[in-house]
Each structure stands twice: as structure tokens, then as C-alpha cells.
Amino acid sequence: MKAVSIEAGERSKAKRVHGVNRGISVFDLVLRIVALVGTLASAVAMGTAGQALSFSTQIVNFEAQYDDIDAFKFFVVSNSITCVYLALSIPISIFHIIRSRAGKSRVLLIVLDAIMLVFLTSGASAAAAIVYLAHNGNTSTNWFSICQQYTDFCQRSAGSLIGSFGAMALMVLLIILSSIALSRR
């Protein structure tokens, strides 16, 4: 640390920046835990979504499950991988609380957070497009809405998008916070 002369009436700001970085690191940890819970809840909600219609016969079975649609499979996989990444990044976030001036690990987290954000966004966007079609259909291509028959399945799949889009917003905040902490170093 540089020696700086302080005139009467002035306070040193060296410890203040260190304390701000520690506060940013604590907030980073909290955001990672909340994003982890959001992605986990989204993956579990979509992965367990399924509904069979009550008028199914022995010959024809009317059933909707998440694994019938590839976009929903990708949604579950992208949320699961992001959840595992967030769990593995928590020790690094704790390390940043202890050593708030660490720089290389912050750069690594920024890059990996950005990659996971893109991965999570692509999975959530693909699932959102299918949920939109399930709710509204597409009359120009004669795709009818299935949500009048499969109400529980549609509600569960639409609800699982909430946690994923919330985690996306938190990932953006994580990237911004890490960039701010890195610039204050």
C-alpha cells in the first residue's frame, strides 16, 4: 500500500475501499445462493411436470410430460448445469470475502458467469417459446393451444420459467458486481 500524506481534517479512504469490496463480496455470495435456489427450483419444477388426461383409453394415452419436448429437456439441462456451476462457485465467492483484493479469480468468475448466463438464457428462451405456443397456439399453422386440456402441466411449466428468468437477472447483477469490485481493486 502506498504511503499517502493526510492533511488535518481528512480521512484515509484506503480501508473504506477495502470494506466496500468486502460488502460487494458478501452481496455476491448472497446473490449466488439465491440464483442457485432459483435454477434448482426451475429444473425440479420442469423436470417433474407431467399430466395425463382423465379420458385416456387403453389404446390411446393422452399424456404431456416435459421430456416430450426437446426445448424443455434443454431447459432442465441448462438450469441443472448452471445450478451446479453456482454451487461450485460459492467457495470462490467466500474466498473473495476473506481476500477482497483478489483479482485473477474475479476475472475468472466474470468470464464463467457470462458463459453460464448465455447458456441459461438460451435454455429459458427456448422453453418460453414452447410455453407461449402451448398457451396461445399458432392459428396460421393450425397449432392449437393445449393448455385448455393440460392445465396443470402448463401452469407448472410456465411457473418454472419464473425462477430461471430471475436467476438470469441475478447472473447479470453478479457480472456487474464482480466488475465493480475488480475496478475498485
From Swiss-Prot:
Keywords annotated in UniProt: Cell membrane, Cell wall biogenesis/degradation, Glycoprotein, Membrane, Transmembrane, Transmembrane helix
Primary site of residence: membrane
Compartments in which it is found: Cell membrane
Keyword Zinc among UniProt keywords: no
Pfam families: CASP_dom (PF04535)
Spans traversing the lipid bilayer: 33-53, 74-94, 107-127, 161-181
Tagged with keyword Transmembrane: yes
Parts of the chain on the Cytoplasmic side: 1-32, 95-106, 182-185
Xref: InterPro entries: CASP/CASPL (IPR006459), CASP_dom (IPR006702), CASPL (IPR044173)
Membrane topology, from the record: Multi-pass membrane protein
Glycosylation: residue positions: 138
GO cellular component, one term: plasma membrane
PANTHER family to which the protein is assigned, alphabetical: CASP-LIKE PROTEIN (PTHR36488:SF12), CASP-LIKE PROTEIN 1U1 (PTHR36488)
Cited function: Regulates membrane-cell wall junctions and localized cell wall deposition. Required for establishment of the Casparian strip membrane domain (CSD) and the subsequent formation of Casparian strips, a cell wall modification of the root endodermis that determines an apoplastic barrier between the intraorganismal apoplasm and the extraorganismal apoplasm and prevents lateral diffusion.
Subunit structure, interactors included: Homodimer and heterodimers.
NCBIfam families per the UniProt record, alphabetical: A_tha_TIGR01569
Family stated for the protein in its record: Belongs to the Casparian strip membrane proteins (CASP) family.
The name this protein goes by in its record: Casparian strip membrane protein 1
Source organism (scientific name): Solanum demissum (Wild potato)
